[in-house]
């Protein structure tokens, strides 16, 4: 039995789900971040993070490790390019999505979903815009060089980037026809894929079911890459203030 400890809003869980769907692998998905699932998630991942894949008793945590396991165990319909150079590039894009892109989007959006009405530190939005624009430019070049997808054929690069890039418009940093025509075309083609249509529909259904039901949060769980981006961008004092105010929590070891 294959079980995916999932959450429809987690970009990492969304990536894994799309990989499983792309490969045609059956699985049972559960929203492991729901309060009633907390104990089950803790039993397989004490950090209480999703996704986790239980493949008939083989338990894998961390989305990149899950994808690597699935690719090796079920090589049909690969998500890693066969060409070694393109494979390295695809893995690099996955890593960039999982670290830099996730950190930017999390650290900006936390003021929308966690503490609505609160004021972000001065300069945070500008730092996010600068780094996102640089990433868009790199993607534009990658699509010009490789096409039709980020690393030639559809790969983990596309499936890792897509969940994050579905949210950038809401943050006020969209990619545009004028400045990023190839990236916009890529995004539109991604949204037409069955696995991406299903992904977007699950997110929309999840958000609609919870509209107006956002609980008040006392603290946010922060982890490495999300903290690293803040510190690298010079927001040390703001983050120290959050720690002193008791609004920062850390994942379990």
What are the residue ranges of the model-derived segments?
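GST-like domain detector, emphasizing the conserved glutathione-binding G-site
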Residues: 1-130, 150, 226-253
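Residue-level detector of family-conserved "landmark" positions at structurally sensitive sites
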Residues: 30, 63, 178, 200-201
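A generic membrane alpha-helix/interface feature
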Residues: 42, 49, 116, 171, ...
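Juxtamembrane helix-loop transition sites at the ends of transmembrane segments
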Residues: 45, 119, 179, 215-216
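Short capping/connector residues at structural and topological boundaries
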Residues: 58, 84-85, 154-155, 180, ...
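GST-like fold's C-terminal all-alpha helical module
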Residues: 97-192, 198, 231, 251
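Charged/polar, low-hydrophobicity segments characteristic of intrinsically disordered regions
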Residues: 192-209
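Long, charge-rich low-complexity segments
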Residues: 204-238
């Amino acid at each position: 039995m294959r079980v995916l400890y999932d959450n429809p809003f987690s970009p990492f869980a969304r990536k894994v789900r799309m990989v499983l769907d792309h490969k045609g692998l059956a699985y049972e998905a559960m929203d492991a971040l729901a309060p009633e699932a907390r104990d089950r998630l803790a039993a397989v991942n004490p950090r209480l993070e999703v996704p986790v894949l239980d493949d008939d008793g083989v338990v894998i945590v961390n989305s990149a490790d899950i994808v690597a396991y699935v690719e090796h165990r079920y090589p049909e319909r690969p998500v890693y390019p066969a060409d070694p150079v393109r494979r390295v590039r695809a893995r690099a894009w996955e890593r960039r999505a999982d670290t830099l892109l996730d950190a930017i989007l999390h650290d900006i959006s936390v003021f929308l979903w966690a503490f609505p009405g609160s004021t972000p530190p001065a300069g945070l939005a500008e730092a996010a815009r600068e780094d996102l624009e640089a990433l868009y430019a790199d993607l534009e070049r990658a699509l010009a060089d490789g096409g039709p997808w980020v690393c030639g054929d559809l790969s983990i690069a596309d499936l890792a980037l897509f969940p994050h890039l579905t949210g950038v418009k809401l943050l006020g940093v969209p990619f545009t026809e004028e400045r990023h025509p190839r990236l916009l075309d890529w995004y539109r083609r991604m949204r037409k894929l069955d696995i991406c249509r299903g992904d977007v529909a699950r997110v929309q259904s999840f958000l609609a079911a919870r509209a107006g039901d956002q609980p008040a949060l006392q603290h946010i769980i922060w982890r490495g890459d999300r903290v690293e981006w803040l510190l690298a961008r010079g927001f040390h004092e703001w983050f120290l203030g959050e720690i002193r105010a008791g609004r920062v929590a850390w994942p379990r070891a």
